[in-house]
Amino acid sequence: MKNLHSLFLASAFLAGFCGSSLAGEREGVVVSIKPLHSIVSAVMQGVGKPKLIVQGAGSEHVYSLKPSDAEAIEHAKVIFWAGPSMETFLDKPIDTLGEGAKVVALGDAKGLTKLKFREGGPFEAHDHGHGGSHEEEHDAHGSGDHDHAAEVAEEGHEHHHHGEYDLHFWLDPQNGKILAADIAKTLGESDPEHAAQYEKNAKAYGEKLDALTREVAAELKPVKDKPFIVFHDAYQYFENRFGMKAAGSITVSPEKAPGAARIQQIHDKIKSLGATCVFSEPQFEPKLVKTVVDGTKARTGVLDPLGAELKDGPDLYPQLIRNLANSLKDCLSK
């Protein structure tokens, strides 16, 4: 009897495997990076859990796809990522392994506040690999009031004007709210049975992010006008939302070490502006930051745009935003 039961379970497993993989059926949700995975997780609560590609302290700038990642992409029904200019390591795998899945570049979500890359002076020139013109002109230095941000609401996910826009859009919690609604819509179309649950979750998460936005704005108000330097220019969405003032970045690409002239330029900028803090990131060696602040009165801190040390899941994203605020306030208020 026991052997018969084991045989039945084995047969059922094989039948399920053949019915999905061999028949080409897709199931499950895959997300590229931790902040976006957190928002998707919140929308999917009570229904399922998405698969995360870049885990732990990994960075989308230098990540190499693992066999388990490739397998997840191959069988995914829905794939969420920021877009081809952010997670370049996913370009080819999505085109090949992801063929047949619904692939959603969240950088194209309707209604997002989108900001152009900052260039010139303390902000090093960017390489617009996927460049393309846009119908509207936007403020390239959107680190002030929200009115300076570009509200782009084009045609959903069909267009890919990533080259001129900064894709760290999730660092504005109000963008996070828009993403949650967009994700709920996408999941509801792929899984109509749970569409109402996705919508309910997204609404609740949006309300949570509204409260978080108010909380962070109040916390940062005393240090809004204090200049600081960041490791790479990833934070202008956060700055724009909360009226912060980055004076420059050490490098535009974390995987590309700046030259001696660039380091000297930032060093001089710190001295001339009296920049209070220079921030590193946990994904990369802090040696450059130490070199830049040497001989100045600037302190050092850590800003994490990905939630490297946070536990994956729906709570990661709000905690990431809160941690950015805490790190800025702690360093700038000393």
From Swiss-Prot:
Keywords: Disulfide bond, Ion transport, Metal-binding, Periplasm, Signal, Transport, Virulence, Zinc, Zinc transport. GO terms for cellular component: periplasmic space. GO terms for molecular function: metal ion binding. It is found in: Periplasm. Residues 120-147 are annotated as: Disordered. Disulfide bonds join C277-C331. Zn(2+) binds at E60, H61, H168, H232. This is High-affinity zinc uptake system protein ZnuA. One of its GO terms (biological process) is zinc ion transport. Part of the ATP-binding cassette (ABC) transport system ZnuABC involved in zinc import. Binds zinc with high affinity and specificity and delivers it to the membrane permease for translocation into the cytoplasm. Required for survival and normal growth under low Zn (2+) concentrations. Also required for virulence and intracellular growth in host cells. It holds the Pfam family ZnuA. Residues 1-23 form the signal peptide. Belongs to the bacterial solute-binding protein 9 family. The keyword Signal applies.
